[in-house]
Amino acid sequence: MLIFIPILIFVALVIVGAGVKIVPQGYQWTVERFGRYTKTLQPGLSLVVPFMDRIGRKINMMEQVLDIPSQEVISKDNANVTIDAVCFIQVIDAPRAAYEVSNLELAIINLTMTNIRTVLGSMELDEMLSQRDSINSRLLRIVDEATNPWGIKVTRIEIRDVRPPAELISSMNAQMKAERTKRAYILEAEGIRQAEILKAEGEKQSQILKAEGERQSAFLQAEARERSAEAEARATKMVSEAIASGDIQAVNYFVAQKYTEALQQIGSSSNSKVVMMPLEASSLMGSIAGIAELVKDSANKRTQP
């Protein structure tokens, strides 16, 4: 009897070991009994029926990255374009992912490639290059809906690269260079135009200010002439009144002042060869005496009845 005890202990340990399962974090295991799915083991320690239950599939529940192989797509405008993409998936239902499709990753890759050809084949090359976000969103919606029966959640689909043919790339580069040159010429012409406009505006303002200054100067000159004329008229009036009243001194002062001004104007002449000599004193006195006689005659006429 004692010899069978170690054997029984060993058998018990084997049975316990066959019935105890430890599932790592991030995984779920399916359990099959006689080839039929019965339950799903969650992460941690779990028990199964020894020799009757077995582990069917070990499903990775973490988000996974599937590299979509490069493929050529013919665009709507008949351009052969090489497309490179990547797909992010996560299993949300382990039993369906294990038993609804035979090769999950291969099925998702083929499904994604097919939809890439469908979506991008309906677009022109310019749209492929400029609307990548829209393409990603459209692919995500289509592929995620198609993988729902498999218990898969497609989180992202990214178009990593869109490569046109080499000759088309050269043509596009030449077109871009021509476009940049065109924009440079346009900017240069616009700068010259703005400079000419500013120059014209400056000249316009200068002419306005110049005209305003000339107008102000003319106004001041006219005002000065008007004042001079008024002063001349007042002086003439005063002389007339002095002659009428017989004031010889006022007449003499007026005549002497005009004589002096005339000499100053003649002396300031640019012709240095002209030498002006003042009138003789006797002639000047004779002129004054003649004016005095006129004043006396005028006074006598006023006193006569």
From Swiss-Prot:
Consequence of gene disruption: No visible phenotype.
Signal sequence, renumbered to the chain: none
Statement: the UniProt record of this protein carries the keyword Repeat: no
Keyword field: Cell inner membrane, Cell membrane, Membrane, Transmembrane, Transmembrane helix
SUPFAM superfamilies linked: Band 7/SPFH domain (SSF117892)
Record topology, Cytoplasmic segments: 24-305
Keyword Cell membrane listed: yes
Record-linked PROSITE patterns: BAND_7
One annotated GO molecular function: identical protein binding
Cystine connections: none
Protein location: Cell inner membrane
Subunit description: Forms oligomers. Probably interacts weakly with FtsH.
Alphabetized PANTHER family for the sequence: STOMATIN-LIKE PROTEIN 2, MITOCHONDRIAL
Name under which the protein is recorded: Protein QmcA
